[in-house]
Amino acid sequence: MTEETMIAEIARTLGIRPAQVQSALSLFAQGNTIPFIARYRKEATGTLDEVQLRCIQEQYEYEQALASRKETVRQSIMDQGCWNDDLARSLEAARQLQDVEDLYLPYKPKKRTKASMARDAGLEPLADCFASQDPKGPAPEDAALAFLSDDVPTVEDAIQGAANILAERFSERADFRRHLRRELWQQARLTCSLQVEEDQAGPMLTYADFSERVARIPSYRILAINRGENEKKLKVTLKEPADRHIAMLCQLVITRPSPYDQILRDAAADSYKRLISPQMEREIRNELTAQAEKQAIDVFAENLRHLLLQPPFAGQIILGLDPGFRTGCKAAVISATGQVLDYGTYYLTHSEQQKHQSAVSLANMIRRHGVTLISIGNGTASYETEQFVSHLIEAYHLKCRYVIANEAGASVYSASDLAREELPDLDVTIRGAVSIARRIQDPLAELVKIDPRAIGVGQYQHDVNQKALSAALDQVVTSVVNYVGVDLNTASPALLQHIAGLTAATAGNIVAYRNENGPFQNRQDLLNVPRLGPATFTQCAGFLRIKDGTEPLDNTSVHPESYGLAEKIAGHYGLSHDELKDPEKLAILRDKIQMNAAPKLAASLGAGEPTIKDILEELRKPGRDVRSDFPKPLTRRHVLSLSDLQIGSVVRGTVQNVVDFGAFVDFGLKTPGLVHRSQLSRHPFRHPTDVVHAGDIVEAEIISVDAARGRIGLSMKKVKK
């Protein structure tokens, strides 16, 4: 396949123009990153976004792998002297790696099989005789007599050996496998049965006597079934009409009446049962798992993206609480800039005396430091801690509220090398409380310090391919960090290393330079950082912000290469470069700017319209944090209990997690309520993430309460918007 053909195929698959694909591939080849291309090369790519660019990259890699595999297969078949025009055409037409493997199967070197042993015994000519289906050929027994030997002592052995060769040949027919694959995907059913007693089955009891068409099984069910099978609790099989498929194979391989009909029928049945069906079952099971894992990874990535985009509670003094029963609740107060001001351990669930002492101490700590928000981790003893805090606020008339924070990964961070470096004087348990406070103060800055897999906002995350999961989540972190941008003078190395063009080493060099030379005054200072050259500067500069520096445009996402253009646009509205620092002048500019003026400005300034629009947006809202467009976590002063709930009442809460079957909503109880996908919306949708995202604030009606099991059913369909 030529490069031009490959580009055309990618464009067709993604529904974009070949020129866009070509431009994106050229930019990749020049070493440009996806965030940089998406933000600053819109004219070149026709405004392709990050998702489209990543699809181009992945599809191109697939097409290259496909072309490489085709060449390997072609060379192998040629070396065997079996290459022909039909194979050449079929291989050229193959669009999937599976199609290539089907074509290669008859020529692929094999392990020792029944068929290979029969060939070694010299029975291939007898198999050819049967396959010829000569109506006037000798009887099978007579034909077999010529092949008797020490290895083949009887006529029955000879016929069976030849039949084994035929069975293998039939199993390698690409046309039948292709047709059968389509049939199985449309008609086959996945069935389960219990392998243990019902009282030992646990959640797998749901899948006792389970049967569903493979084309309809949702991904979370596939992963649940796989888990049950791995735990030896379920027996899983693919149920399909084998007799009909054997008849189809017989129709394909028996082309005319001959003395060998029964041998061919028996060989076809053996081929299907022993070779084809098990192979197809493995293939379909593997493909179902691959699709389910991809869906699970996509859901995790979508949830993670919205968690990272949660707005910060900037400028607030926050008390972080890491709840616990036996070892007590760890507390840490952080300043408006995230510095640790105070910390301690309190026993909120022990004796009344200890609870009273803890209440007095915590109330004093809150007043002493002017705490405005309390962040409570949602792990063990979270509900009990929430009850304590709610009572504390009311009893001591404290002027603060509390919020429940997702503490997943806090313990991982607190024991990490990074935590020891950042908080060397604090015990590992106190570091967890600091992290819980910081992840509310600035979720993005804190969560990037943790392996995203540990954040736990997915479904069956431990059952999927961990390498693929890590790659997908790392892409999300990188995408969000660059979308938001970071403060060059306060960002940690953990945050900086996700900026386009930067690595852990260059991020460390930036922080070292900052520590030695003081705050960066402008983006050009980056070129003084060791091992940060012009190419890296081009990639990263637009995503790094400097507040109160010498260049006002450094606090925007305008790239330095477009500063001249930005100044011309400001001049068009009557502002000089220096006036861009004046808040009053900027307010006047904001009122003057009209986004529909972009086409005329682009024409008069000889620039691309997408870049003009981006600059106008930045001049309207310089220094804006894009996370402000998203809802902040819900804060509370009072706690709910099951006894407070009534069917039909409406509650307000925060979406904790979105999965294939619905969304879990925290509205102040010990366990979150479930909005099943059937209760999410009156309008049709493909996936729950089309309706809600992790971190969203929603209202829902209580439709069921199971006090014994602690389950609450919610509906968003019945709530008036």
Each predicted region: which residue ranges?
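Generic start-of-chain signal for non-secretory N-termini
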Residues: 1-22, 29
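Long, highly charged, low-complexity intrinsically disordered interaction regions
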Residues: 3-6, 58, 64-82, 92, ...
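Duplex nucleic acid-engaging cores and interfaces of nucleic-acid transaction enzymes
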Residues: 36, 52-55, 62, 66-320, ...
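Short, ordered loop/turn segments at secondary-structure junctions
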Residues: 40-42, 131, 241, 323, ...
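Structured, non-catalytic alpha/beta "coupling" segments that mediate domain-domain communication
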Residues: 76, 90, 100-104, 228-243, ...
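A glycine-rich phosphate-binding loop feature that marks nucleotide/adenosyl-phosphate handling sites
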Residues: 182-190, 321-325, 380-381, 405-412, ...
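Single-stranded RNA-binding regions, centering on S1/OB-family and related RNA-binding modules
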Residues: 549-550, 554-721
